[in-house]
Amino acid sequence: KILKNFGKAKIITGSNVFAHIDNLDLFFKNVKKLLENQGVLIIEVPYFLNLIKNLEYDTIYHEHLSYITLIPLNKYLRKIGMQIFDVEEKDIHGGSLRIFMSKINDYKKTTKFIKLIKREKQAKLGDIKKLVKFADKVKKNRLELTSVLTNIKKKGKSVVALSAPAKGMTLLNYCKLDKDIMDFATE
């Protein structure tokens, strides 16, 4: 229906919605149908490398079905006739990627993309030991945070949360920051 009414697209964009897609095969099948030759799909996603490096476990929550790194995403895309050809690093959400994709061989891979692939390989994000170490750091962070907040409460001071986004709920629930620690939260 979209093709019939509007024709093929030169550019399709999606910022911070990709992690919510529950059927990537169907999504990319339709993107390929909608993109004209030399068309570009641009998505912006929180970057898993930064999540691990900066201990951003609060960005993990029920609505996010995927966390993106370039190596497996590009491998998947190549199997379905697409590729990543460029990438930009963004500061939003603790560090995000704007990823530029096309049908295979429509565009030459940029130096930025190649450098980030090398950085991902060096980071060994697919190594289970790296992920276990991350989990251990998360547990340690929870203990440290609850200790600091408990000490603040013991001194008779208030602990409040300003704003309560989904990410905040992950932190509050995982760290068990309930009414005994938090005086109130406000949006």
Question: Residue locations for each model-derived region?
Answer:
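Short amphipathic alpha-helix with an adjacent loop that forms part of the alpha/beta core around
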Residues: 1-8
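A conserved beta-strand element that flanks and buttresses the S-adenosyl-L-methionine
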Residues: 10-14
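Hydrophobic adenine-recognition pocket in adenosine-nucleotide-binding enzymes
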Residues: 17
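A short glycine-rich, Lys/Arg-flanked "PGG" loop and its adjoining helix->strand segment in the class I
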Residues: 25-42
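Short, glycine-/aromatic-enriched active-site segment of Class I SAM-dependent methyltransferases
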Residues: 43-66, 70-73, 77
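Conserved S-adenosyl-L-methionine
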Residues: 82-93
